[in-house]
């Protein structure tokens, strides 16, 4: 189980990313439209004004059940460890166990 503080930090980053998403997107569109280098630099400065944690690259997928940051399956939102346990317990419809 991940520490509670790390999970809360990730939730805070998600909220910040949603809050500043439109500002970042509009600034990036402006950069592609503007031709002059000085205007581009002004827009780049404007793009750097939101907090760092609002950047989408700072987000990290975590397991829905445990908060584990590694080995996550996007389709389920679970880490491989928990996914395997749930499949063996028949809690995920449509998932098949592998046996070899």
From Swiss-Prot:
Transmembrane segments: none annotated. SUPFAM superfamilies: Glucocorticoid receptor-like (DNA-binding domain). It holds the Pfam family Ribosomal_S14. Gene3D superfamilies: 1.10.287.1480. One of its GO terms (molecular function) is rRNA binding. GO terms for cellular component: chloroplast; small ribosomal subunit. Keywords: Chloroplast, Plastid, Ribonucleoprotein, Ribosomal protein, RNA-binding, rRNA-binding. It is found in: Plastid, Chloroplast. GO terms for biological process: translation. PANTHER family: 30S RIBOSOMAL PROTEIN S14 (PTHR19836), SMALL RIBOSOMAL SUBUNIT PROTEIN US14M (PTHR19836:SF19). Belongs to the universal ribosomal protein uS14 family. Part of the 30S ribosomal subunit. Binds 16S rRNA, required for the assembly of 30S particles. HAMAP family: Ribosomal_uS14_1. This is Small ribosomal subunit protein uS14c. It comes from Coffea arabica. The lineage of its organism: Eukaryota, Viridiplantae, Streptophyta, Embryophyta, Tracheophyta.
């Amino acid at each position: 189980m991940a520490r509670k503080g790390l999970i809360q930090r990730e939730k805070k980053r998600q909220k910040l990313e949603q809050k500043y998403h439109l500002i970042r997107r509009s600034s990036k569109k402006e950069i592609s439209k503007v031709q002059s280098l000085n205007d581009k630099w002004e827009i780049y400065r404007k793009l750097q004004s939101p907090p760092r944690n609002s950047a989408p690259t700072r987000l990290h997928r975590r397991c829905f059940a445990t908060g584990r940051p590694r080995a996550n399956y996007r389709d389920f939102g679970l880490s491989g460890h928990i996914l395997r346990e749930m499949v063996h317990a028949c809690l995920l419809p449509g998932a098949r166990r592998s046996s070899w």
